[in-house]
Every structure is written in structure tokens, then in C-alpha cells.
From Swiss-Prot:
It comes from Nocardia farcinica (strain IFM 10152). The record marks 180 as: Transition state stabilizer. HAMAP family: PGAM_GpmA. Substrate binds at residues 9-16, 22-23, 61, 88-91, 99, 115-116, 181-182. Pathway: Carbohydrate degradation; glycolysis; pyruvate from D-glyceraldehyde 3-phosphate: step 3/5. One of its GO terms (molecular function) is phosphoglycerate mutase activity. Its EC number is 5.4.2.11. This is 2,3-bisphosphoglycerate-dependent phosphoglycerate mutase. PANTHER family: PHOSPHOGLYCERATE MUTASE. Belongs to the phosphoglycerate mutase family. BPG-dependent PGAM subfamily. Transmembrane segments: none annotated. It catalyses: (2R)-2-phosphoglycerate = (2R)-3-phosphoglycerate. The active site is at residues 10, 88. GO terms for biological process: gluconeogenesis; glycolytic process.
Length: 245
């Protein structure tokens, strides 16, 4: 028996469109992002993938994408679980800043270290910064990070996968995870056993479902597959080029 998992990065957000580091800042989808969410749901339906449960973050761009996709797939009625551990990586002091300007100010090498290295976090966000999450009611009782690298995201995402999400898969449920570029990269790294060095080259496009078929050990039985490979390739290339505009 195989188990079906679908990963979905949220549709384009307002800050994606502005080329800003977003992280834990709670921004809306653009009209394009809404359309991407709808198309994602249509792709699920076209491929006969019927999610039984959805996991998403506490950020509206992922929650909205999940809701739009489920509505388009006529699965709006299934359970939705929201958890902060699926949040995007916290970009620290970079949150709200333009990627191209950061690259120009600090140079390509430092920019790429902060953006794509496995274990180098950006500078921590300062108390009182308008893009800090201190005092946000949704994070009550949580030790809110001040910055994160991808390793930090792996360390919160993978235990949640193992303790919670995996149980639904092994119970025979088709699981949809609607989350963010880095929380999904963390999970893909775990599932496909990608090295710390190679993960830097993995870019996940917005709004295109990525399907896994997993065995009883929750290891892939075949390579991961985007439901729209051509659009995914173009989208991944666009993500890779961020900072260059």
C-alpha cells in the first residue's frame, strides 16, 4: 500500500510581488495568488486527488490558499489543522526588507548565505520592530524565534511531521500540507534525504501541488511530482532569481 501526500506552497503574496522578505509577517495574497490557489484545487480534482485532511500554518497566505484550493476541489468540508510549526522561516531583521536592496548592501555572498544556507540565520529582529511577532495572541505560550535558518525550521517541522502528520497518512488518509517555501523545503529535505549542501538549490514555486507516494516507512516509492511540471519549472526559476530585481 502507498500513502498520498500533497505539498502546496501558498499562492503569490503581496510581499512576494514586492520582492520583500516576509517570514512570519502576516500578509495577504495578491489576485494572482488567489488564482493560483484556485488552480491548485482544480489540479487536485483533475488528478483525482481527494484530500481527507489539511495541515497549514498560522499565516493567512497559507490558510487562504488552502481554503481556496479546497473550495475549487469541492473538498471545503474536510478538517483543517493549523499549527505554527508549519510557519515560514523567521527572517529576523530582514523581515520587511527588499531582497535586491539587501543583496546590493551586503553583497551576493552574504545575501545568499542568509537566504539559502542551511545553518546561517540572518541577524535577529530587534524588540519593538514593527515586523516582530511579540504580543501576537496566536503565539501565546510559544517561544517566538527572533531569527531562523533552515536547520531551525527542520528542527520544528520534522518532529511535528513524525508525531502528528505521519499518523494521518499511516491511517490511510490523503494529506494536504499547505504551507511555505521553507517549511516545505524542510520536509522535502527529510523525505528525500537531501544533503545540507544540495538543499540550497531546491526552490518551491507558489501554488502548484507537489505529490508524493510514500511506502509504509513514509519513504518515497517514486520521485516527487508536480501536478503541472511546466508551470512548476518556470515558478521555481522565478523563485531562484529573487533578489535580482
Amino acid at each position: 500500500m502507498t500513502y498520498t501526500l500533497v505539498l502546496l506552497r501558498h499562492g503569490e503574496s503581496e510581499w512576494n510581488a514586492l520582492n520583500l522578505f516576509t517570514g512570519w509577517v502576516d500578509v495577504h495574497l495578491t489576485d494572482k495568488g488567489v488564482a493560483e490557489g484556485k488552480r491548485a484545487g482544480e489540479l487536485l480534482a483533475e488528478h483525482g486527488i481527494l484530500p481527507d485532511i489539511v495541515y497549514t500554518s498560522l499565516l493567512r497566505r497559507a490558510i487562504s490558499t488552502a481554503n481556496i484550493a479546497l473550495d475549487a476541489a469541492d473538498r471545503h468540508w474536510i478538517p483543517v489543522v493549523r499549527d505554527w510549526r508549519l510557519n515560514e522561516r523567521h527572517y529576523g531583521e530582514l523581515q520587511g526588507k527588499n531582497k535586491a536592496q539587501i543583496r546590493d548592501k551586503y553583497g551576493e555572498e552574504q545575501f545568499m548565505l542568509w537566504r539559502r544556507s542551511y545553518d546561517t540565520p540572518p541577524p535577529p529582529i530587534e524588540a519593538g520592530n514593527e515586523y516582530s511577532q511579540e504580543g501576537d495572541a496566536r503565539y501565546a505560550g510559544i517561544d517566538i524565534p527572533k531569527t531562523e535558518c533552515l536547520l531551525d525550521v527542520v528542527n520544528r517541522m520534522v518532529p511535528y511531521w513524525e508525531s502528528t502528520i505521519s499518523k494521518d497518512l499511516l491511517a490511510g488518509k490523503t494529506v494536504l500540507i499547505a504551507a511555505h517555501g521553507n517549511s516545505l523545503r524542510a520536509l522535502v529535505k527529510h523525505l528525500d534525504q537531501i544533503s545540507d549542501e544540495e538543499i540550497a538549490g531546491l526552490n518551491i514555486p507558489t501554488g502548484i501541488p507537489l505529490r508524493y507516494e510514500l511506502d509504509e516507512n513514509l519513504r518515497p516509492v517514486r520521485p516527487r511530482e508536480y501536478l503541472d511540471p511546466e508551470a512548476a519549472a518556470a515558478g521555481a526559476a522565478a523563485v531562484a532569481s529573487q533578489g535580482g530585481k
